[in-house]
């Protein structure tokens, strides 16, 4: 049985989550679909990467993770499959993968091109890619390999003087705890 995780900025009030799950189950009726979160702030790939980073390694190897945050397919932004740390990440080439780890590099990145010219939503493309992988398909058949993904580099910590450090709040949890850039390596900050 396949395990597919979903993480999005859809929210929980509309029908997008049901649509995504319906599409997945239509392709892979025995899939185990796990919701990581659908409450990511709209278009916030930094928050999405933080949540993904804290959760993905707890899943079995070869789990397929669909991250639909800021994932509009356009000429400027490709949809990709990244084989990273023995997991598959299906998302947009928007800097998300670069935020998962500085130490671990992706084994392979594929720009999804099997549906060029298809104006379907990104979730339809993600589902087709996930189904291909789950059925044992080689990710090379989904498109073309890309060597360099977009990198997100705006989270640098800056020291202005001996007593001032500037950083960024990455995530605010349900208890009001703030995670900021200098905490990023600390797993249990609150």
Give the positions of each predicted feature.
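N-terminal glycine-/serine-/threonine-rich phosphate-binding loop
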Residues: 1-75
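Alpha-helical architecture
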Residues: 7, 68, 91, 171, ...
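Short, acidic Gly/Pro/Ser/Thr-rich loop/turn segments
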Residues: 11-13, 74, 97, 174-177
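Active-site histidine-anchored catalytic micro-motif
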Residues: 27, 43-48, 60-69, 73-125
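A generic local secondary-structure boundary/capping motif
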Residues: 54-56, 78-80, 100, 155-159, ...
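Anionic-ligand-binding alpha/beta catalytic cores of soluble enzymes and soluble regulatory domains
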Residues: 117-179
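Single conserved hydrophobic/aromatic residue that forms the stacking wall/gate
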Residues: 180, 184-190
């Amino acid at each position: 049985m396949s395990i597919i995780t979903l993480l999005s900025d859809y929210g929980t009030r509309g029908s997008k989550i049901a649509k995504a799950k319906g599409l997945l189950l239509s392709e892979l009726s025995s899939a185990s679909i796990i919701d990581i979160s659908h409450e990511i702030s709209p278009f916030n790939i930094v928050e999405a990467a933080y949540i993904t980073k804290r959760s993905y390694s707890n899943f079995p190897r070869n789990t397929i993770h669909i991250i639909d945050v800021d994932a509009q397919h356009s000429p400027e932004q490709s949809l990709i499959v990244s084989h990273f740390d023995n997991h598959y990440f299906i998302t947009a080439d928007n800097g998300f993968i670069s935020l998962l780890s500085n130490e671990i590099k992706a084994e392979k990145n594929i720009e999804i091109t099997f549906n060029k010219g298809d104006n379907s939503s990104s979730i339809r493309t993600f589902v087709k890619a996930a189904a291909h992988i789950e059925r044992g398909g080689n990710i090379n058949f989904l498109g073309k390999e890309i060597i360099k993904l977009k990198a997100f580099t705006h989270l640098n910590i800056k020291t202005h003087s001996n007593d001032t450090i500037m950083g960024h709040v990455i995530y605010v949890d349900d208890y009001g705890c703030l995670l900021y850039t200098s905490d990023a390596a600390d797993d249990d900050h609150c």
